[in-house]
């Protein structure tokens, strides 16, 4: 999605899209899938012919269980005119690996908030060098879903290594996010945000803040990057609907 829209002039528009009605046309005939372990971290890669972009994202066990990664890679290949390598690295302890600081609303585990930087170091110093050795150096997009999307935005404020961010349903309701985002400008050149239109109507009082949090992030991205470099897309449904498609 980000690959297709980097040069678009209408990035700032809110978009509503019901994914189930999207028709895709295959653009890649073959895709190579590799399962690799790097520093004890399982990594699954999907590579099309003649890749032009790296896509990196944290993955959780439910994505593997539901075959979500395979479906995601297939949909990207069908929808994109550009070749790519998608690398999903396992985060079996989701909150520990991705939360940049502690928030009891996410988990009371005292380890939560201590390891997001370690995850970023793994990506920058272990995963990316392996990918570049295997496929060559190319622009790198970081993305994710839920806490993974929040981590992707956080990471893009820590390093200029990522050219773009794809954040689907980012957990920007966590305590302190707005302060962090204001104080740490994003270093990527393009940012894609999405949210389900039912997410801000949930019963959880903290999670109900997500709509305004994402709108505020989108406005901040417009200020930092320009209107044509950021998109906020509204999808039908709640937080757990159509994850691979989104």
Residue map of PLM features:
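A conserved short beta-strand
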Residues: 161-173
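The feature captures the conserved acid-bearing segment of alpha/beta-hydrolase catalytic domains
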Residues: 171-242
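Active-site signature of alpha/beta-hydrolase-fold catalytic machinery across serine-
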Residues: 154-158
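Serine-hydrolase catalytic machinery in alpha/beta-hydrolase-like enzymes
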Residues: 52-134
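A domain-start/cap signature at the N-terminus of enzymes
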Residues: 1-14, 23-53, 84
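Gly/Ala-rich beta-loop-alpha elbow adjacent to hydrolase catalytic centers
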Residues: 143-148, 152
């Amino acid at each position: 999605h980000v690959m297709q829209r980097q040069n678009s002039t209408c990035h700032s528009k809110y978009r509503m899209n019901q994914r189930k009605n999207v028709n895709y046309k295959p653009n890649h005939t073959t895709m190579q899938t590799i399962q690799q372990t790097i520093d004890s971290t399982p990594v699954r890669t999907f590579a099309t012919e003649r890749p032009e972009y790296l896509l990196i994202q944290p993955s959780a066990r439910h994505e593997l269980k539901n075959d979500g990664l395979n479906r995601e890679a297939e949909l990207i290949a069908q929808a994109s005119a550009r070749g790519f390598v998608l690398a999903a690295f396992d985060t079996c302890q989701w909150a520990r690996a991705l939360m940049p600081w502690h928030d009891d609303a996410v988990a009371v585990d005292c380890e939560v908030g201590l390891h997001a930087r370690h995850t970023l170091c793994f990506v920058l110093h272990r995963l990316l060098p392996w990918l570049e050795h295997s496929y060559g150096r190319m622009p790198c997009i970081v993305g994710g879903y839920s806490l993974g999307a929040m981590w992707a935005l956080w990471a893009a404020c820590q390093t200029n290594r990522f050219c773009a961010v794809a954040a689907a349903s980012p957990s920007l309701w966590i305590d302190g996010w707005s302060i962090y985002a204001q104080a740490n400008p994003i270093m990527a050149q393009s940012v894609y945000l999405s949210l389900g239109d039912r997410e801000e109507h949930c019963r959880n009082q903290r999670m109900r803040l997500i709509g305004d949090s994402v709108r505020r992030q989108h406005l901040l991205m417009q200020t930092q990057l320009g209107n044509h470099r950021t998109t906020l897309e509204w999808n039908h449904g709640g937080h757990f609907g159509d994850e691979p498609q989104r």
